Amino acid sequence: MGSVLGLCSVASWIPCLCGSAPCLLCRCCPSGNNSTVTRLIYALFLLVGVCVACVMLIPGMEEQLNKIPGFCENEKGVVPCNILVGYKAVYRLCFGLAMFYLLLSLLMIKVKSSSDPRAAVHNGFWFFKFATAVAIIIGAFFIPEGTFTTVWFYVGMAGAFCFILIQLVLLIDFAHSWNESWVEKMEEGNSRCWYAALLSATALNYLLSLVAIILFFVYYTHPASCSENKAFISVNMLLCIGASVMSILPKIQESQPRSGLLQSSVITIYTMYLTWSAMTNEPETNCNPSLLSIIGFNTTRPVPKDGQSVQWWHPQGIIGLVLFLLCVFYSSIRTSNNSQVNKLTLTSDESTLIEDGNGRSDGSLDDGEGVHRAVDNERDGVTYSYSFFHFMLFLASLYIMMTLTNWYRYEPSREMKSQWTAVWVKISSSWIGIVLYVWTLVAPLVLTNRDFD
């Protein structure tokens, strides 16, 4: 009897595998909008891919992957073969994820509302989509080696560079929303408390940035060497100071009342992270000490004969993963009315659509059990670009690939090495990020005939 009830329970979920997103989540989650629930499911699927990629880097798993016929054939380089298998596995897994999201991005071009037949593919058919993704990933493991790893390294580097810039755009949006929320609460009541909170958050960000700069000069520079690191730290410090001063100039405040030091402090600490991440990719080990050596621990990891070592975990990579998760989930739930950011991310003003959706009672709600319902708030128009959202996840897959492999490149000499290319990609992205932030400050002054509200 129990088995029959169990089968009936499982059977009740079968329509959900081919139906809309709310059917999957609304049985265990509160009521919500279809647009938000769908994005969360895609983000959770990407998170599962990240977890699998992390598992593939575990030495025990690498030994199992090494049993795949021909996967690590004729690899007799300096770096152990099982390490190469781990990095290759991440490349192929992320290749499959990236191709899955790129395919959806191309399929969803110019979808205007949920009444478009392609919107049903975006918001439903989950079983078939996930099965397709798994099939693409499995197929990626049978791609002949050849130049695949080298070519995909450069593709991943370009995609990761673009995703870093998207991270910065979302970070600017988050900082603006954060500042606006606290300023509104400060004006409504208990102004001293909220003013102190705003000031404390700003001061903490700048304090952490200052501590980071001091540590960079202490551990990543030497009096007679490491001139590149000295230049990176100094230039980024001056750029952050300039952007912070610019954000509180009277002319900027007049045209951009929402600008302030809180946003600048968030951009500053993110720039310091990019600077640190870039310096940790330098090939010269004397200018790139490991975190364990900095804090005084002696490592006992095996080192090959030529001294080329491979570390399985990287602190800057862990921080990068945390930022990645925050970015993806924030982009999945954000309902910001910041018009500048919405234009950059091809997002509509969601508030009006939500209000319209909440006002409907006939056919607008996906009935669930009890009060668990989801609003189809995209019948009159999508609240975000389906195509751009999938393209962002495509770039996120490449960013994860580069982060988990620490931006290492597989050399023809069969060594896993850091590259100056990765250093310059990260440093240039930090510079472009500051330029983008400064542009959000000065754009209303330069383009006076345009509305930036």
UniProtKB/Swiss-Prot annotation:
Positions of modified residues (Phosphothreonine): T352
Localization: Endoplasmic reticulum membrane
Cytoplasmic side: 2-39, 110-123, 173-197, 253-259, 331-387, 448-453
Expressed in which tissues: Detected in brain cortex, hippocampus and cerebellar granule cell layer.
One of the protein's GO biological processes: phosphatidylserine metabolic process
Keywords, sorted A to Z: Endoplasmic reticulum, Lipid biosynthesis, Lipid metabolism, Lipoprotein, Membrane, Myristate, Phospholipid biosynthesis, Phospholipid metabolism, Phosphoprotein, Transmembrane, Transmembrane helix
Residues carrying lipid (N-myristoyl glycine): G2
MF-aspect GO terms: acetyltransferase activator activity; enzyme binding; protein-macromolecule adaptor activity
Record InterPro entries: TDE1/TMS
Induction: Up-regulated by kainate treatment in neuronal cell layers of the hippocampus.
Phosphoserine modifications at: S351, S361, S364
Main location: endoplasmic reticulum
Lumenal side: 61-88, 145-151, 219-231, 281-309, 409-426
Membrane-spanning ranges: 40-60, 89-109, 124-144, 152-172, 198-218, 232-252, 260-280, 310-330, 388-408, 427-447
Membrane topology (UniProt): Multi-pass membrane protein
GO CC annotation: endoplasmic reticulum membrane; membrane; plasma membrane
Membership in a protein family: Belongs to the TDE1 family.
Function: Enhances the incorporation of serine into phosphatidylserine and sphingolipids.
Summary of subunit composition and partner proteins: Interacts with SPTLC1.
Protein name as catalogued: Serine incorporator 1
Gene behind this protein: Serinc1
